[in-house]
Structure formats: structure tokens, C-alpha cells
Curated annotation (Swiss-Prot):
One example of a Gene Ontology biological process annotation: L-tryptophan biosynthetic process
Binding-site residues for anthranilate 1, renumbered to this chain: 81, 112
Taxonomic placement: Bacteria, Pseudomonadati, Pseudomonadota, Alphaproteobacteria, Hyphomicrobiales
Transferase in keyword set: yes
The organism of origin for this protein: Methylobacterium radiotolerans (strain ATCC 27329 / DSM 1819 / JCM 2831 / NBRC 15690 / NCIMB 10815 / 0-1)
Reactions accelerated catalytically: N-(5-phospho-beta-D-ribosyl)anthranilate + diphosphate = 5-phospho-alpha-D-ribose 1-diphosphate + anthranilate
PANTHER family the record matches: ANTHRANILATE PHOSPHORIBOSYLTRANSFERASE
The name this protein goes by in its record: Anthranilate phosphoribosyltransferase
Pathway the protein contributes to: Amino-acid biosynthesis; L-tryptophan biosynthesis; L-tryptophan from chorismate: step 2/5
Length: 345
């Protein structure tokens, strides 16, 4: 494709694209007109040099322009991560999203099937009975009736099919592993955003600021988790209406004991679904602790809690009262009621 060649030449020469150039390059990639050789060379060159903030912003703009959007309340929040931590943990952000919704904050949870783990958000939700791949109208109804919807990435980003084969053949993660979490189909302005590499925390927070996010906590656990961890401290880069700050979260400050990494180990989707249901039924374990800590943070990000201690307390109450369990039941019911024969589990 002639329009793509200058962008490929620039990146292959070790130079960075500006925002407009990056958007144009990714417009071409997502159109399906770029050859597999060109796409592979471009993505690999970006990976080797390291993507700049402007390149990621431009790429995300191209991705967002092609996504299938879902209507959501202005205060909707997402709890999402880049993945790639290879921890094999339980589904933390999925349970945290359910708890946040039970606290009265609308959650548009964006996610996909597992890539580097045994159980992604889509996998565990399907095992719990949630219908996947709903159309935007059905998703909006789930959000209205359950306070929560699951935005199945492959259903909302059809243009990704044009780079799927190239990505599967490359031996490294590419910029597209970042673009999915940055491209919530509901256009949420509030995110609890996990990264598996500490070096990505500030750049991706700046990307989200450029893309219009209002309040974000980008988190990286000391154990490598793309979550707020309970095995040690977590580094946070926070965005609040254009201003960035850095701080550390220690779970012990919120009455949560430090846990061993093995206590967060998950299994296949069925195993993780049973673990999630056990927490909602009252189990007190490491999974509950990490879920309420992350849910509490999301409540602060969404403006529903003034401080993390308050957010954690709200999250604990939502679990203990049965509200979180009822929220999951409503999501299962709503997603099946409004599926209209769309993709199953």
C-alpha cells in the first residue's frame, strides 16, 4: 500500500512517528490493505525501538474510530489491564468490576479471552453463565438492568481481524496488546488500568490523558501483577483532570494481610468461576482481599469514594451484604434475556 510505505520506512529507520502519522499508519493497518510482510516489519520495528506516547495515542485514535460503540452513563468506569503478567492468577479485575457495580457505579468492563493466561475475563464470565458478543443495544440494556456490561473485545473491534494473522506469527507482544485496553467501546472517562511492566505506567497514563480520560489510576504490583496486589506494595500513577501524581499502596494500611503469590494462583475458567462464586458467597481469602482492594480503588477513580479506605469498606460491604452476588445474577439474566440468538458461551 503506497500510503503506508513512508511510515514503514520512517519506523524501520529508527525514527518516531508523530501523532498524525501514527494515526494514518494504523488507519492503513486496520483497513486490511497493508501486506502481511509490511505489517510484521512495522510492528516489529516499533516494538524493538519502543513505542512513543504520540505513536500510541495516534494508534489508539485509529482503533477507536473503527470500534463498535456502546452507550454508557458519563460516570461509567472500566477495570482493565494490559495482561501479559504470566501470573496465572484468578480473575481479579472481573470480580472487582462486579463489586464496583454492586456499589452503584456503572461498569463497562472491556476484555477478551485469555492470551497469556488460562482464563481471561471472557472465559470466566462465560463459565459463570454470562452471554458474550451481544450487540450494542443489548449491552446498553445489561448496563441499565445490572449496572454492569461486558464488552467482548473481538465483537467490538472487527478491524483487528486484519492484523490477527500477523500478530499470531510474531514471537513478541506488540502495540496492539496495549491498544485493546486503551479502546473501551463505551468511551469511559474513568479507569483503573493495570500494567504488567512498571515502565509502561506513566506513558500509558499520559496516553489516556491525551485521549480524554478524566481520572485514571494506572497500577503495577511489586509482584508483577497488572493489578493492585496484596502480596506487597503497588506503584500507582494517577491522573486527575490533567494532573499526574505518583504514590504507593500498601494493603496492610487497609487492614489486609500480606498474602503469598500462591494464594492468588488460578486455574482454568471453570476453576476461576468457582473461586469467584466462593468469594461472593462469603469466602474470606486472598482473592476476596485483592478484589475489594481493586474495587475500592475503582470507586475512588469513579468519584464514589473520597479515599481508598472508604472505597475498600464499601467494597467489603457489597460482598458481605450479598449485593455483589445479586449483581452477577442480574448480569447473567440480562445478558441471556437480551442475547437474541447472538454468540453464546
Amino acid at each position: 500500500m503506497d500510503s503506508f510505505r513512508p511510515h514503514l520506512a520512517k519506523v524501520a529507520g529508527g525514527l518516531a512517528l508523530d501523532r498524525a502519522e501514527a494515526r494514518a499508519a494504523f488507519d492503513d493497518l486496520l483497513s486490511g490493505e497493508v501486506t502481511p510482510v509490511q505489517a510484521g516489519a512495522f510492528l516489529t520495528a516499533l516494538k524493538v525501538r519502543g513505542e512513543s506516547v504520540e505513536e500510541i495515542v495516534g494508534a489508539a485514535e485509529a482503533m477507536r474510530a473503527r470500534m463498535t460503540r456502546v452507550a454508557a452513563p458519563e460516570n461509567a468506569v472500566d477495570v482493565v489491564g494490559t495482561g501479559g503478567d504470566h501470573s496465572g492468577s484468578v480473575n481479579v479485575s472481573t470480580l472487582a468490576a462486579i463489586v464496583v457495580a454492586a456499589c452503584g457505579v456503572p461498569v463497562a468492563k472491556h476484555g477478551n479471552r485469555a492470551a497469556t493466561s488460562r482464563s481471561g475475563a471472557a472465559d470466566v464470565l462465560a463459565a459463570l453463565g454470562v452471554r458474550l458478543g451481544l450487540d450494542p443495544a443489548a449491552q446498553a440494556r445489561c448496563l441499565d438492568e445490572a449496572g454492569l456490561c461486558f464488552l467482548f473485545a473481538q465483537a467490538h473491534h472487527p478491524a483487528m481481524r486484519h492484523v490477527a494473522a500477523v500478530r499470531s506469527e510474531l514471537p513478541v507482544r506488540t502495540i496492539f496488546n496495549l491498544l485493546g485496553p486503551l479502546s473501551n467501546p463505551a468511551g469511559v472517562g474513568y479507569q483503573l488500568f493495570g500494567v504488567a511492566q512498571a515502565a509502561l505506567a506513566e506513558p500509558l497514563t499520559r496516553v489516556l490523558a491525551e485521549l480524554g480520560s478524566r481520572r485514571v489510576w494506572t497500577v503495577h504490583g511489586s509482584d508483577g501483577l497488572d493489578e493492585i496486589t496484596v502480596t506487597g506494595p503497588t506503584q500507582v500513577v494517577a491522573l486527575d483532570e490533567g494532573r499526574l501524581c505518583h504514590f504507593t499502596i500498601d494493603p496492610r494500611e487497609f487492614g489486609l494481610a500480606l498474602r503469598a503469590p500462591e494464594e492468588l494462583r488460578g486455574g482454568d475458567p471453570a476453576d476461576n468461576a468457582r473461586s469467584l462464586e466462593a468469594v461472593l458467597a462469603g469466602a474470606r481469602n486472598a482473592y476476596r482481599d485483592i478484589a475489594v482492594l481493586n474495587a475500592g480503588a475503582a470507586l475512588v477513580v469513579a468519584g464514589a469514594a473520597q479515599a481508598l479506605a472508604d472505597g475498600v469498606a464499601q467494597a467489603q460491604d457489597a460482598v458481605d451484604s450479598g449485593a455483589a452476588r445479586a449483581t452477577l445474577a442480574r448480569l447473567v439474566r440480562a445478558s441471556n434475556d437480551h442475547s437474541n440468538g447472538q454468540e453464546g458461551r
